[in-house]
Amino acid sequence: MGSQGLATLDTPPNTDSDTNSDVKAGGLSVRRLTLTDFRCYHHQRMDLDARPVVLTGANGAGKTNLLEGLSFLVPGRGLRRARLADMMRRERGEDIDVPPSQVRPWGVAATLGSPDGEVEIGTAYEKAANGNRDKRIVKVDGEVAKSQAVLADHVSVLWLTPLMDRLFVEGPGARRRFLDGLVFGSDPAHAGRVKAYDHALRERMRLLRDGSKDLGWLASLEDTMATRGVAVAAARLDVTRRLGVQLAADTGAFPGAAIEVAGPVESWLGDGPALAAEDRFRAVLAGARGSDAAEGRTTIGPHKSELMVRHLGNGQAAALCSTGEQKALLIALVLGSARMRAQERGCAPMLLLDEIAAHLDSHRLDALFDEIIGLGAQVWMTGTDSSLFKPLAGRAQFFNVAEATVTAVL
């Protein structure tokens, strides 16, 4: 991508004094957002203040694409978990898979305001040469960062999308990813531990399938799984304990909830120190080589742990609750996580709530709006019906999205 790609990261300094005076204490906000060749946007710039943001428009207009761009201000794969190349803007009728020579760089750049001042963040897609993996590049205040992990030092974002509405009824993998996202917001190093564990998990299984006799290499991989796996489980337990305090209170519109993560490794941590849990995990892995090889999978570890959520009002597991109750529980989880981060970091995270008004009655929607305002966070909300957001008149900034063009509603 070279200099062309890096250019998409740069945001002109925000010198408008009237947009710097209203950053709420405790809130992180986007003051300027620029998307370049990202999804449906050729070049889109938005100038904002610290208030919540409401984006309305028809389905397919580009609302969720804006939220996805914002989700790349933090480390990771964004709210859609898409390939980097998939976010390249395509001309009308252009195929998803384009020749490498026709791949266009994309970029997302933002000026962020916080209690600590302003910071310029940019991230872009770099097409790899010579068959290497494509990658994201990141700039902070004009300096190229060594890795995207540095973004966690400056930005905290939580999101809720319609695809997450089935979180409690789908397989446990989605719930583990959701939980790991919450952990990562408090402990950026968690992502590295999960990655190291997953790599060792795959390598061990490859050796077992191949019938490898390299016992030393197997033991080394199992040691990595034990140390990293126990650390992953401990971090998950810590966050669920702290989040449980936030979720215990029933706020009226959104139910109180109990949350825990369960599995053998978590149980071992409850029985004694982490080193003892590591030793036990290491021994179990060594003893299970034959059975794991026969089954073609590793049957124990934090990759099998389960996030369990219970509705405190009716005592039911989230999976047994009605669709409306599950939606309310999910919103309660996200709001509780936002409160926890605000208290612990002294700065409320940004929230990205896609189609949040869908399937919420007026009572819960009004309560959500009040919670958002009380949190002091810049919350980005999308919807097709602008009338649902009327209670936020004067308390939020409104934009219309149509055919990949964003227009302020005055």
PLM feature spans:
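Conserved NTPase motor "head" modules and their coupling/switch loops across ABC/AAA+ ATPases, GTPases
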Residues: 1-58, 72, 93-97, 217-227, ...
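An accessory alpha-helical subdomain
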Residues: 164-253, 262-265
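H-loop/switch region of ABC-family ATPase nucleotide-binding domains
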Residues: 382-384
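Nucleotide-state sensing region of NTPase/ATPase domains
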Residues: 75-174, 180-190, 241-248, 277, ...
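Conserved lysine of the Walker
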Residues: 63
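Walker B catalytic acidic pair
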Residues: 354-356
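Hydrophobic "anchor" residues on beta-strands that sit immediately upstream
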Residues: 32, 137, 157, 350-351
